[in-house]
Regions:
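Helix-loop-helix hairpins in multi-pass membrane proteins, especially solute transporters
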Residues: 81-218, 244, 328
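Juxtamembrane helix-start motifs in multi-pass secondary transporters
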Residues: 86-92, 349-351, 521
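Hydrophobic transmembrane-helix bundles of small-molecule transporters
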Residues: 171-289, 296, 314, 321, ...
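Small-residue (Gly/Pro/Ala) motifs that create kinks and tight helix-helix packing interfaces
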Residues: 46, 161-170, 305, 337, ...
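Small-residue-rich alpha-helical segments with characteristic i,i+4
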Residues: 128, 145-156, 300, 306, ...
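Transmembrane core module of solute transporters
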Residues: 20-73, 114, 217, 239-410, ...
């Protein structure tokens, strides 16, 4: 009885104190700050970078390369962290991200920058997935809402500081003899070193190592499946969607998907993404919703800053601040929904409301035009932010709650992985659609009577002709007379910095054409989010657990110890009743030596 009591006392002791949890969260926030700050800095500075490196048309490669590698790396980090612990993998992720940042800061062209951004993505995959997995380890599902404010504060701070820093760097010619925009990447180094120091000092999470094979074949098949499909999404408009190269990409991608499914089935529990997870209807539906919402979320976050800079003439810094309605909407709805979930344990309604608000926001964007004020776009951003705040954490929470404690890491990374797939596809497809539409929409804008009248008036104005700011656009107009509006539209695939400084009458057809092309991608996003809205009604909400993964593991161990002790005591008691001796802890009965001897027959007289 004494032994049983001891086991119970140890198991009921707190796994982590509140102070320890806070220090762990500080370490996680440092890593997440590094990742979120990088995204806001790069996003608002991309136009300046693309103009300087003469490659706006391939800027999608810079974004897509980052998303491809971060997407592929995400489930690998999740599986390896289940095997070797979260801490070493999180440290590796930060280190890789810093190396990629240093290399990106010295890129000489857009292709080189895309390659180094891909290296950054290998680290970012861990920075995005592991904090959520660690939160799943140390906090019960209903308790996590109490700590969401810390992470939202980090996200909000980086969202405000990032555009400001990015705009200052992008607008500076040189800082310490280095091009200003290069500091967009180099600034990660001091921040990353500080984050690494915090993680090394405070991030210590209990871990039980499991001997499971690493699914390298699964990782290889993911690469084979994703890369060609994303390449054709980016290059399809130039190759032709039915060209030989496009068909080859479709075929290789399909074979990769088939190979991945077969590999995961053969690997069983050791799979990169165990297929047993999809036996849960909650996990399966949350995964589908994550893909669709990721498509809309990343598409919006990457295209809206470009729209604000090109059409509304905002600087990179201004475009970052103009995105604040989306960030504020996300914070408000996330905090509110998190507190409600923590108190009630119910979450089914939030994906429904969230996707509905996102759909309303994208529908709002379909009315965008070159003559609409900036505040019009801010209204749509607020709606999208209010929707996102109710969806993202809720879907992750549902995925984590649908699996056992041992699968928290792989479930979290899988949830992030599929959301990243949606985001990667969204960016590649939406940018492809955008630049495919631009030549046609600009050609149509040049046929507008008001635009033609403005061009004619500007062409007869001596001041306009003499102003050096108009030289680039006048040259394009002169060269475009032979090729028509479509050839003029191709000019937006390169340097666009001349548009905001040119005479408004000369720039009007270009800006109107770009705005109309952007409306097309918002219709596409709206269609995708509406599908998510309909599917969200079918998300089965399972009751939230009251214990964290670590507490459940400790409880399971306590139960196992008690069962073993009870079995041993029962065997001892039974042996005592039989007058036998029992070897302690085994439950086996040791019979006296005399009882094992064969009795000798009696001699008859």
């Amino acid at each position: 009885v004494t032994n049983t009591s001891t086991v119970s006392q140890n198991a009921d002791a707190p796994i982590l104190t509140h102070r320890q949890i806070l220090f762990i969260i500080f370490g996680l926030m440092a890593g997440m700050f590094l990742s979120s700050l990088d995204q806001t800095i790069v996003g608002t500075s991309m136009r300046t970078i693309a103009d300087d490196l003469h490659g706006l048309s391939i800027q999608a490669w810079v974004t897509t390369a980052y998303l491809i590698t971060s997407t592929i790396a995400t489930p690998i980090y999740g599986k390896l962290s289940d095997l070797f612990g979260r801490r070493p993998l999180f440290i590796i992720a930060i280190s890789i991200f810093l190396i990629g940042s240093l290399a990106a800061g010295f890129a000489q062209d857009m292709y080189m920058l895309a390659g180094f951004r891909a290296l950054q993505g290998l680290g970012a995959g861990g920075l995005m997935a592991l904090p959520l997995a660690i939160m799943g380890d140390i906090l019960a599902p209903r308790e996590r809402a109490k700590y969401q404010g810390y992470f939202l504060a980090v996200f909000a701070t980086s969202s405000v500081i990032g555009p400001l820093i990015g705009g200052l760097f992008a607008g500076a010619d040189q800082i310490l003899f280095v091009d200003g925009w290069r500091w967009v990447f180099l600034v990660n180094l001091p921040i990353g070193v500080g984050a690494l120091a915090l993680v090394l000092r405070y991030l210590h999470v209990p871990h039980t190592r499991h001997s499971v094979r690493i699914d390298w074949w699964g990782a290889a098949s993911v690469i084979i499946a994703l890369v060609p499909l994303l390449i054709v999404a980016e290059q399809g408009r130039e190759w032709g969607w039915g060209s030989l190269g496009a068909i080859a990409c479709y075929t290789i991608g399909a074979l990769g998907i088939a190979a991945f499914i077969i590999t995961e089935k053969l690997m069983g529990d050791a799979a990169l993404i165990p297929l047993k997870l999809f036996k849960s209807s909650t996990f399966s539906m949350a995964t589908v919703l994550g893909v669709l919402v990721g498509f809309g979320m990343f598409g919006a976050m990457m295209t809206i800053p470009l729209y604000l800079q090109l059409v509304n003439g905002a600087t990179p810094t201004e475009s970052g601040f103009l995105m604040l309605p989306m960030i504020l909407g996300l914070m408000i709805s996330s905090i509110t929904s998190g507190q409600i979930i923590s108190r009630t344990g119910r979450y089914k309604i939030f994906p429904i409301i969230g996707t509905g608000l996102m759909a309303a926001g994208f529908f709002w964007f379909t009315f965008a035009s070159a003559d609409k004020p900036v505040i019009f776009m801010m209204g749509g951003m607020l709606l999208v932010g209010l929707g996102l705040g109710q969806i993202m954490q809720t879907l992750t929470l549902a995925s984590q709650n649908s699996v056992g404690p041992r699968d928290i890491g792989v479930a979290t990374s899988s949830s992030t992985f599929f959301r990243q797939i949606g985001g990667t596809a969204g960016v590649a497809i939406l940018f492809s659609v955008l630049f495919s539409r631009i030549p046609d929409t600009i050609a149509a804008a040049f046929q507008d009577k008001d635009n033609l009248a403005g061009l004619a008036a500007a062409a007869q104005d001596p001041e306009v002709l003499a102003d050096p700011k108009n030289a680039k656009i006048l040259e394009l107009l002169q060269n475009g007379q032979n090729g028509g509006g479509a050839s003029l539209g191709d000019s937006l695939n390169g340097d666009t910095s001349f548009l905001n400084s040119a005479d408004p009458r000369l720039a009007a057809p270009f800006l109107e054409g770009f705005a109309n092309a952007t409306v097309t991608i918002y219709w596409v996003s709206l269609a995708v989010v509406l599908v998510a809205f309909l599917l969200s009604f079918f998300l089965k909400a399972t009751p939230l657990r009251q214990k964290s993964a670590i507490e459940e593991a400790a409880s399971d161990k306590k139960d196992a110890d008690e069962r073993e002790l009870a079995t041993s005591l029962d065997a001892q008691h039974a042996a005592d009743l039989a007058g036998a001796l029992v070897e302690a802890g085994t439950g086996s009965i040791e019979l006296p030596e005399d009882t094992l001897r064969t009795p000798k027959p009696r001699n008859k007289r």
